[in-house]
Amino acid sequence: SAMGQRTGCPLKESNMVSRYKKEFLELERIGVGEFGSVYKCIKRLDGCVYAIKRSKRPLAGSSDEQLALREVYAHAVLGHHPHVVRYYSAWAEDDHMIIQNEHCNGGSLQDALLENAKRGQYFLEAELKEILLQVSMGLKYIHNSGLVHLDIKPSNIFICHKLAVEGHAGQEESDSEDEFSSGVMYKIGDLGHVTSITNPQVEEGDRRFLANEVLQEQYCHLPKADIFALSLTIALAAGAGPLPHNGAMWHHIRKGNVPSIPQKLPDGFLELLKLMIHPDPVERPSATALTKHPVLRPSLEKTVQLQKQLNVEKCKTAMLESLMKDQPLSAKLPESETSSKQNSKRLVGGKNCRSFSFTLGY
């Protein structure tokens, strides 16, 4: 009976008409993987374009089903963030599982790298920093939600080009997506390997991007495995050759050596990429640290300095004011000096005010 079929599987749809065919118009296949295929579709109801992932339905109750459901559960936990591919819906029909996600009009970073390779090009410094910064923002959000991605690589980073046509209509509502002057947004997708930081069920991602400690089944610093994979992703975007799956070169990289990059990048930037693949995960910067890193956000560094200076000045002023409240300066000075405005002014001006010292916790 139809009822009998539905038990024990959270993904069963009982009605026989395909929801996929009914609700979506398939335009083209845009991706294919071991799981199945991704199609660019228009939803008939709203006229919007979506990326629809159709995969062979795993056996109910199998470990494959758990894996297939990870992505759905992860999206449910995560909610919406500008640097994570947005999730809309998931369901199952006949022998397929279907996930409806945001469509990124620029394809994946992997697509862009293949295109670059054909033309003998690669991403340059400014773009590389932009990718690193934006993906770090997505990772910061994922990690702060208590999750890790565990499959960061070019084919799981998606590119959205802001269309110029969007013009003036939506200019008032400036959200975090407008920070990026380049008009390109990079987003993390494919959450099929996502797991919890505190209670991880690790399904290893791509060997080429895998940190050694994860291979050794040491899971105490899992977010740093995402950082490791992100560094190698940036190296590839910078023009590095294909990464090894194993062997001597694989181990050479795990000792903290960035794959050779065919363009001149600033030392500070290369040092950062090197730090991100440090053999000791504790030494690698967190995603939060990357989002504030002076190499990626030089203007932020200036702002922080000015903020500190301002705080110091505020502190001095406050202390001077409280001192003057407690003991009026006039009480401390001989008559002749109080009458001389110049001196009291100099005392308050703080230039040669040596009457107290204080330290600030920076």
Placement of each model-derived feature along the sequence:
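Conserved N-lobe beta3->alphaC-helix segment of eukaryotic protein kinase catalytic domains
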Residues: 55-79
